[in-house]
Swiss-Prot record:
Cofactor binding, note field: Binds 1 zinc ion per subunit.
Annotated compartments: Cytoplasm
Cellular component GO terms held in the UniProt record: cytoplasm
Record function comment: Functions in complex with FlhD as a master transcriptional regulator that regulates transcription of several flagellar and non-flagellar operons by binding to their promoter region. Activates expression of class 2 flagellar genes, including fliA, which is a flagellum-specific sigma factor that turns on the class 3 genes. Also regulates genes whose products function in a variety of physiological pathways.
Gene behind this protein: flhC
Pfam families, alphabetized: FlhC
Organism annotation: Proteus mirabilis
Name of this protein: Flagellar transcriptional regulator FlhC
Keywords for the protein's UniProt record, in alphabetical order: Activator, Bacterial flagellum biogenesis, Cytoplasm, DNA-binding, Metal-binding, Transcription, Transcription regulation, Zinc
């Protein structure tokens, strides 16, 4: 009979608390810690004040392909890849650090969830590792973006270089100072010779 390590359990509890605080779903907690489902539910209720949401995890690569989600997913995954290459982090630690970097660069709008939730970011890493998604380089800006695996990359153009028309409409409605500055610059384009 294997004896439970108190140190291992303490690390799992600390990790579970950090993941819950960042918005992880129960399935992610079960996968990344060795704590029982009952203990995780108890911990979740204690930290969040409500039971964890029920239901299956998202299992579609298509979510990552829509223009806005793709930009956010690509930002997260590039941060994750940098952390792996620099040797500073691996596994769930790299996911958490990359997600914190993502939130720092793309803070959610007040009273709204971030576009890329932690569980989706974790799922993205698993999709890339399993070969369902990949990074492709944009032929215009040379940025690396998430695409379907085995998609021809020779003519790939990202949604920043070639935004869909609905993206431009959304930007014009935005109160975000960065978007307003871009709108002003767009307006000045007509005066260029």
């Amino acid at each position: 009979m294997s004896e439970k390590s108190i140190v291992r359990e303490a690390k799992d509890i600390r990790l579970a608390m950090e993941l819950i605080t960042l918005g992880a779903r129960l399935q992610m907690l079960e996968s990344e810690t060795q704590l029982s489902r009952g203990r995780l539910i108890k911990l979740y209720k204690e930290l969040r004040g409500s039971p964890p949401p029920k239901g299956m995890l998202p299992f579609s690569t298509d979510w990552f392909m829509t223009w806005e989600q793709n930009i956010h997913s690509s930002m997260f995954y590039n941060a994750y890849r940098f952390l792996l290459k620099s040797g500073g982090s691996v596994g769930i630690e790299a996911v958490v650090k990359a997600y914190r970097l993502y939130l720092e660069q793309c803070p959610p709008v007040k009273d709204q969830e971030p576009i890329l939730a932690l569980t989706r970011a974790w799922t993205l890493v698993r999709f890339v590792e399993s070969g369902m998604l990949q990074l492709s380089v944009c032929t215009k800006c040379n940025g690396s973006f998430i695409t379907h695996a085995h998609q021809p990359a020779s003519n790939y153009v990202c949604s920043l270089c070639q935004p869909p028309s609905r993206a431009i409409k959304k930007r014009k409605l935005s109160a975000n100072p960065a978007d307003i500055n871009l709108q002003l610059l767009d307006g000045l384009e007509q005066f260029r010779m």
